[in-house]
From Swiss-Prot:
EC number per UniProt: 5.4.2.12
Cofactor(s) needed for function: Mn(2+)
Lineage, uppermost ranks: Bacteria, Pseudomonadati, Pseudomonadota, Gammaproteobacteria, Enterobacterales
Matching InterPro entries: Alkaline_phosphatase_core_sf, BPG-indep_PGM_N, Metalloenzyme, PGAM_B_sf, Pgm_bpd_ind
Record protein name field: 2,3-bisphosphoglycerate-independent phosphoglycerate mutase
Natural source organism: Salmonella choleraesuis (strain SC-B67)
Name of the encoding gene: gpmI
Gene Ontology CC annotations of this record: cytosol
Pathway: Carbohydrate degradation; glycolysis; pyruvate from D-glyceraldehyde 3-phosphate: step 3/5
Length: 514
């Protein structure tokens, strides 16, 4: 009979940041006796989850992808956002062979260059400065037909903030004398990640057929009409932008399409609709043979050109566990499953030897304020069973509630989400203690602790750049170290497990055994 393992458990409370002011703070306004007691009685510290400490530009808010890559890597990983900023600043972006070839191919054949992406200064999935650089690259290389298909944000940015961005691009096209905004649509449609293909189809038809529910002469006019219909940026319905006498911007065989999002999870579905010959998410009314370029690799099985292929990370936490013959479990709901697997493993899709995965379906609701507890009860049940099973050396779990409900901007719902989590943490803590295991509770970035923007008074639906908690529960007598960051978590776990830390991990343990 094999000896029961005492697991090292990492619970990531997504979007659960630390802020001392109670005003508009869903976490401090919720009843959280369990987390309050843990914070009061257990070793704890605050860690950085944003900006330079996670490889993002200074003061840039953290996000789930970046957070999990840093958590699993045990070193600061410079993100695509920072990498692209540097490339554009140093002008190497304008010589990227994949991008220049794609533009030249269309130009030489008299075809159009279509550029699509999330038009946002949020910096989570994309950055409008990168899209602007792509517009400049296309114009500089002599492309005549340049069409921008703008996905609108309102989630990583204030709910109604797209007008300034659209105006900037309309001014740019006017100044350079070629190109235009061809369509606008909310990210709710274009950037789904939960197989809601009816949404994706609307965005796909808008771009391929130049057909939408609405039409406007200019992008700004189209946006203002959406606001008049009470649609915030995220939910703007498919709108064709075409003034009297302007050519149709429908996509044709031989056109180039460059997708300027750098984050993978919400880029995959629409990319597959364009690229996969055997795509079956919906019946495509028009299949276009495009020269399709992904800015970064959205998935290894999407067979199309990549402008910036991934840099590989050696000896992430998951790989190091496998090399040391340890068993590990990754568990979350649909919304954050990719984060505890693909992102935590440094962009590796395949599970490592000894790595098991459990996926709990997120509830099928339009927005999560309608079900703030999400699937946390089922997730907790499965997590507790895994802790008690004695099968795993380590377990990584993500609870999405703080982030997914925080994104809705609905304070009452976010409070309910936090209260549901407190009950879950109670069960998890008891299970870990009953088997003599160890538990770290932390977050990947903030969100629910700031539900209203103090400057604008609008709902605050974006992440924050505030620190996140880190709490230790276990039998070891440990002392917390100040000044930590997300990339210190993997070394902390290895140290608590009594394991060697690989040299590639430059993070430091945040709990020292006394």
């Amino acid at each position: 009979m094999s000896v029961s393992k005492k697991p090292m458990v990492l619970v990531i409370l997504d979007g659960y940041g630390y802020r001392e002011e109670q005003q508009d703070n869903a976490i401090l306004n919720a009843k959280t006796p369990v987390m309050d007691a843990l914070w009061a009685k257990r070793p704890h510290t605050l860690i950085d989850a944003s900006g330079l400490e996670v490889g993002l530009p200074d003061r840039q808010m953290g996000n789930s992808e970046v957070g999990h890559v840093n958590l699993g890597a045990g070193r600061i990983v410079y993100q695509d956002l920072t990498r692209l900023d540097v490339e554009i600043k140093e002008r190497t972006f304008f010589a990227n062979p994949v991008l220049t070839n794609a533009v030249d191919q269309a130009k030489n054949a008299g075809k159009a260059v279509h550029i699509m992406g999330l038009l946002s200064a949020g910096g989570v999935h994309s950055h409008e400065d990168h899209i602007m650089a792509m517009v400049e690259l296309a114009a500089e290389r002599g492309a005549e037909k340049i069409y921008l298909h703008a996905f609108l944000d309102g989630r990583d940015t204030p709910p109604r903030s797209a007008e300034a961005s659209l105006k900037k691009f309309e001014d740019k096209f006017a100044a350079q004398g070629k190109g235009r905004v061809a369509s606008i649509v909310g990210r709710y449609y274009a950037m789904d990640r939960d197989n809601r293909w009816d949404r994706v189809e609307k965005a796909y038809d808008l771009m391929t057929l130049a057909q939408g529910e609405f039409q406007a002469d200019t992008a700004v006019a189209g946006l203002q009409a959406a606001y008049a219909r009470d649609e915030n940026d995220e939910f703007v319905k498919a709108t064709v932008i075409r003034a009297e006498g302007q050519a149709d911007a429908a996509m044709e065989d031989g056109d180039t399409l460059i997708f300027m999002n750098f984050r993978a999870d919400r880029a995959r579905e629409i990319t597959r609709a364009f690229v996969n010959a055997d795509f079956d998410g919906f019946a495509r009314k028009k299949v276009v043979n495009l020269n399709f370029v992904m800015l970064t690799e959205y998935a290894a099985d999407i067979k199309t050109t990549v402008a910036y292929p991934p840099a590989s990370l050696a000896n992430t936490f998951g790989e190091w566990m496998a090399k040391n013959d340890k068993t590990q479990l990754r568990i979350s709901e649909t919304e954050k499953y990719a984060h505890v697997t693909f992102f935590f493993n440094g962009g590796v899709e395949e599970p490592f030897a000894g790595e098991e995965r459990i996926l709990i379906n997120s509830p099928k609701v339009a927005t999560y304020d309608l079900q703030p507890e999400m699937s946390s009860a089922e997730l907790t049940e499965k997590l507790v069973a895994a802790i008690e099973s004695g099968k795993y050396d380590t377990i990584i779990c993500n609870y999405p509630n703080g982030d997914m409900v925080g994104h809705t901007g609905v304070m009452e719902a976010a409070i309910k989400a936090v209260e549901a989590l407190d009950n879950c943490i109670d069960q998890v803590t008891k299970a870990v203690e009953s088997v003599g295991g160890q538990l770290l509770i932390t977050a990947d970035h903030g969100n629910a602790e700031q539900m209203r923007d103090p400057a604008t008074g609008q709902a605050h639906t974006a992440h924050t750049n505030l620190p996140v908690p880190l709490i230790y529960v276990g039998e070891k007598n440990v002392k917390a170290v100040e000044g930590g960051k997300l990339s210190d978590i993997a070394p902390t776990m290895l140290s608590l497990m009594g394991m060697e830390i690989p040299q590639e991990m430059t993070g430091k343990p945040l709990f020292i055994v006394e």
